[in-house]
Amino acid sequence: MPEPGDMTARPPSDDAPQGDAGPLTPGQQAELAAANERAQKILKAGRVATFNGWTIGTFGVLSVLLGLGSLTALVVGAGLLVVAWNELRGRNMVRRFDPAGARLLGRNQLGLMGLIIAYCLWSIYGTLHHPSETIRELEQVTGGPGSVTHLVAWGYAAVIVLSMLLQGFNARYYFARVAQLESYTRSTPGWILQLQRATSGLRQ
């Protein structure tokens, strides 16, 4: 029986009798500290996803607000908002040590890559075949027919390459965390996982 006024209960342990209650033993404290240390590398993926989610969401909102007269901008903005939502949803799953969260984040980055590539290809097509009035005016000033058009097209091509590198790296980073999460959940006592999941909302 715990002493009167002692409200600290020992979490259920895979190695301890279920009816036992009381403060954590030194052994359990050491076990919890070691588990928290091992979890830091995994939880870093959640912090990366937080940054990605809010950054992508900001661009999505701006695309929608600034592109109210453009169907392309609205579609891209809506796509970015979906990606941002999935990024934050995957972040929450990773914080609960759910391997499916890292898998979702990896696929989400591939989806973002596809969205960016599709937008850039569409923009290249429009630039080459239906150049805007601004591009035509610039070419009249520079005196080089097609020079600005091709420069803009090459700019979009560079964005495609950059997205393949950046989103490809992020996807690989997230997918690598799937095996780490699976290993962590297998090797960590159930009471520690339960405690960590219960406090997942407190993490930054």
Predicted regions and their residues:
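Topology signature of small-to-medium multi-pass alpha-helical membrane proteins
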Residues: 2-204
